[in-house]
C-alpha cells in the first residue's frame, strides 16, 4: 500500500464509526495493518481499549495483561511523562512494550509511544511495537493521524456517556416529581427496607407499619415502573420482587431524603 492508500484506510475508520458504537478493536486492527506493528490503545487509566498483534508475544504476564485488558498502573502513570511522539525506543527503555523479563529474546524490539490528546486533555496512549525494522517518518505520520482519529472517538464515546447519564437523571427526576407526597413517602420506606437495588417487598407490611394504604404503594410502584426506573414482579402471597433499572434512582432518592 502507498502512503495515500494507508492514510485513506485510517480515514475510513472515522467514516465507518459515524453513528455506531466505537469499536477500538477494529481501529487497532487497521493500524496494525497499515503500520505493520503490534498496536495497543490504552486509556488514561491503563484500560486496554483495543489491541491487535502482528507478532503475538509468548509471555505469561503479557497474556494475562491482555486477558484482563489492563496495563500495570506504574507503567500507565509513566506514559504521562511522554508528551509527544517518542519513536524507536529500545527494549531497555522504561516504555518498552516488550516484556523486560525476556529482554534477551527481544534485543531488536522497538516501541513507539504516541500520546492521544483531545479537547485539551490526555485521553490515552497509542503504543506500537515491532522487531528489527525502525519506525519511519511515514509510520509516525500514520501513527499520529491514527492517534488523532482514536482520540476523536474517545471524545465521542465520553460525550455519549455524559448524554446517557443526563438522560437517566432526567427520567428519574421526572418519575419522582410525578409522585404525590404520600407516594414519595411510601417509596422512601420501600427502598429503606430493600436496602439495595433489588429485593422482596410485602406491601401490606409496609402499609401497616408506616400508616398508609396499600393502594398508595401500588400506585407509586406503577408510576416508577411505567417510567422504566424499576421493574416489579408479583410473587403472589410472598410479595413483590422489585429491581432498580436506573442507577440514578437511588442516588436521587438519597438526595431527597437528605434535603
Swiss-Prot record:
<keyword id="KW-0805">Transcription regulation</keyword>
<dbReference type="InterPro" id="IPR010312">
    <property type="entry name" value="Transc_reg_CodY_N"/>
</dbReference>
<dbReference type="GO" id="GO:0005737">
    <property type="term" value="C:cytoplasm"/>
</dbReference>
<dbReference type="InterPro" id="IPR013198">
    <property type="entry name" value="GTP_trans_reg_CodY_C"/>
</dbReference>
<dbReference type="Pfam" id="PF06018">
    <property type="entry name" value="CodY"/>
</dbReference>
<keyword id="KW-0804">Transcription</keyword>
<dbReference type="GO" id="GO:0032993">
    <property type="term" value="C:protein-DNA complex"/>
</dbReference>
<dbReference type="InterPro" id="IPR036390">
    <property type="entry name" value="WH_DNA-bd_sf"/>
</dbReference>
<comment type="function">
    <text>DNA-binding global transcriptional regulator which is involved in the adaptive response to starvation and acts by directly or indirectly controlling the expression of numerous genes in response to nutrient availability. During rapid exponential growth, CodY is highly active and represses genes whose products allow adaptation to nutrient depletion.</text>
</comment>
<feature type="DNA-binding region" description="H-T-H motif">
    <location>
        <begin position="203"/>
        <end position="222"/>
    </location>
</feature>
<dbReference type="GO" id="GO:0000976">
    <property type="term" value="F:transcription cis-regulatory region binding"/>
</dbReference>
<comment type="similarity">
    <text>Belongs to the CodY family.</text>
</comment>
<dbReference type="Pfam" id="PF08222">
    <property type="entry name" value="HTH_CodY"/>
</dbReference>
<feature type="region of interest" description="GAF domain">
    <location>
        <begin position="1"/>
        <end position="155"/>
    </location>
</feature>
<dbReference type="GO" id="GO:0005525">
    <property type="term" value="F:GTP binding"/>
</dbReference>
<dbReference type="InterPro" id="IPR036388">
    <property type="entry name" value="WH-like_DNA-bd_sf"/>
</dbReference>
<protein>
    <recommendedName>
        <fullName>Global transcriptional regulator CodY</fullName>
    </recommendedName>
</protein>
<keyword id="KW-0963">Cytoplasm</keyword>
<keyword id="KW-0678">Repressor</keyword>
<dbReference type="InterPro" id="IPR014154">
    <property type="entry name" value="CodY"/>
</dbReference>
<dbReference type="GO" id="GO:0001217">
    <property type="term" value="F:DNA-binding transcription repressor activity"/>
</dbReference>
<keyword id="KW-0238">DNA-binding</keyword>
<dbReference type="InterPro" id="IPR029016">
    <property type="entry name" value="GAF-like_dom_sf"/>
</dbReference>
<dbReference type="GO" id="GO:0006355">
    <property type="term" value="P:regulation of DNA-templated transcription"/>
</dbReference>
Amino acid at each position: 500500500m502507498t502512503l495515500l492508500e494507508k492514510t485513506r484506510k485510517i480515514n475510513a475508520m472515522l467514516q465507518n464509526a459515524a453513528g455506531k458504537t466505537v469499536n477500538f478493536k477494529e481501529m487497532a486492527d487497521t493500524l496494525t495493518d497499515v503500520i505493520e506493528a503490534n498496536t495497543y490503545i490504552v486509556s488514561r487509566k491503563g484500560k486496554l481499549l483495543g489491541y491487535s498483534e502482528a507478532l503475538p508475544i509468548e509471555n505469561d504476564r503479557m497474556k494475562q495483561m491482555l486477558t484482563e485488558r489492563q496495563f500495570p498502573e506504574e507503567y500507565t502513570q509513566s506514559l504521562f511523562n511522554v508528551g509527544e511522539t517518542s519513536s524507536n525506543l529500545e527494549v531497555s527503555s522504561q516504555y518498552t512494550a516488550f516484556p523486560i523479563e525476556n529482554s534477551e529474546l527481544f534485543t531488536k524490539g522497538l516501541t513507539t509511544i504516541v500520546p492521544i490528546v483531545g479537547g485539551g486533555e490526555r485521553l490515552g496512549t497509542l503504543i506500537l511495537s515491532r522487531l528489527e525494522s525502525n519506525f519511519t517518518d511515514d509510520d509516525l505520520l500514520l501513527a499520529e493521524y491514527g492517534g488523532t482519529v482514536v482520540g476523536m472517538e474517545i471524545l465521542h464515546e465520553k460525550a455519549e456517556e455524559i448524554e446517557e447519564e443526563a438522560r437517566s437523571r432526567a427520567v428519574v427526576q421526572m418519575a419522582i416529581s410525578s409522585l404525590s407526597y404520600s407516594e414519595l413517602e411510601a417509596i422512601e420506606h420501600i427502598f429503606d427496607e430493600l436496602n439495595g437495588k433489588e429485593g422482596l417487598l410485602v406491601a401490606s407490611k409496609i402499609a401497616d407499619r408506616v400508616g398508609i394504604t396499600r393502594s398508595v404503594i401500588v400506585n407509586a410502584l406503577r408510576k416508577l415502573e411505567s417510567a422504566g426506573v424499576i421493574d416489579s414482579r408479583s410473587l403472589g402471597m410472598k410479595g413483590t420482587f422489585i429491581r432498580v433499572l436506573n442507577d440514578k434512582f437511588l442516588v436521587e432518592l438519597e438526595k431527597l431524603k437528605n434535603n
